Design a protein with these regions (language model features):
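Acidic-and-aromatic substrate-binding clefts and catalytic sites of carbohydrate-active enzymes
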Residues: 30-33, 54-69, 92-98, 103-107, ...
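Active-site acidic/histidine proton-transfer and metal-coordination neighborhood
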Residues: 76-79, 96-200, 266
Length: 307
């Protein structure tokens, strides 16, 4: 089984020798080549082979700016025995009005460019995060009903067609507190999207945060899984958790090292293994203070399940 890491794992001030997130961005801005070389060296030292790019300063455009071209990024990876496994598209949750034609056109254009980068660097999957829900009972209350889901699913289908034209599969990621993480919501969007163009990236910890059984949910859509995020959680989060710009930080206290939480890892590993050894399994540890040690530990634990 092939293992990689999402670069969000390195989004911790301690790793960079600074005191907050803003200083990480400032450090990257001062010397992008040094920033990305340190990043790729750390991935190499962690023992996994695959890289998943994500939001800035770990964005694919940052990588191109650091090395000069997509081909140069690929060369930098190959020199370290690495490859691009996938790229995470964050744009859907960052548009104020995702239903607008202008916003959709921007995202489609970004996805097209991103897919070309992914292919140039040896990858074949674009993972996409879905828009957030609203806080429970926050006025005006919004529900995820058929009309809302159908409209968004139509755009997701178009997005999947766009990336498929570039040879890249689009996979929906189960981000907690998004419209695609509670078991019913996952089932709904899997029903409404076309399986030829829209695939599935189950994230074990995020499904658990929403009160779901990661294995049961993933098993219902096993044939559409083309990549998976491996992460553990201690418990589900309260239904009235505030959903705002700080939601990702609220998730972090509920995450834990693999094997110390509620994910049924033996069953999860069996399910993912059944999809084939060539599929990427991404270790995503959300801002680890010592990311290299954390990835090594997670990789060793996952390896003990899959050998």
């Amino acid at each position: 089984m092939a293992f990689g890491v999402d670069l969000v794992t390195f989004y911790h001030p301690s790793f960079w020798g600074v005191s907050d997130y803003a200083q990480i961005a400032a450090l990257a801005g001062r010397d992008l080549p040094a920033f990305w070389n340190k990043l790729f060296d750390a991935v190499r030292d962690s023992g996994v082979r695959g890289v998943e790019t994500t939001f800035s300063p770990f964005h694919w455009r940052d990588a191109v700016a650091a090395f000069g071209s997509a081909e140069a990024v690929a060369t930098a990876l190959t020199a370290r025995g690495l490859t691009l496994a996938s790229g995470f598209l964050v744009d859907l949750d960052r548009e104020a009005d995702l239903a607008s034609a202008a916003a959709q056109a921007r995202i489609l254009a970004e996805a097209r460019d991103y897919a070309r980068f992914i292919r140039a660097c040896g990858g074949g999957v674009m993972v996409v995060g879905m828009p957030c829900r609203r806080t429970f009972l926050l006025e005006p209350v919004r529900v995820v009903d058929l009309a809302m889901a159908a409209s968004l699913a139509d755009f997701i289908n178009r997005l999947g067609i766009e990336t498929a034209r570039e040879g890249v599969r689009l996979a929906l990621h189960t981000e907690a507190h998004s419209v695609f993480c509670a078991p019913r919501d996952i089932d709904l969007f899997m029903l409404l999207t076309d399986p030829r163009y829209v695939h599935f990236c189950p994230d074990s910890a995020h499904i658990a945060l929403e009160g779901g059984d990661p294995v049961a949910v993933a098993a219902r859509h096993q044939e559409r899984i083309c990549i998976a995020h491996w992460k553990d959680a201690t418990a589900g989060m309260p239904i009235d958790t505030v959903i705002d710009a700080g939601i990702h930080d609220r998730h972090k206290p509920f995450f834990c090292p693999m094997g110390e939480g509620i994910v049924a890892w033996d069953r999860w590993a069996d399910l993912i293994r059944a999809r084939g050894d060539a599929m990427w399994s991404i270790l995503e540890l959300d801002a680890a203070p010592d990311p290299v040690a954390a990835i090594r530990a997670g990789h060793a634990y996952a390896g003990s399940l899959t050998c």
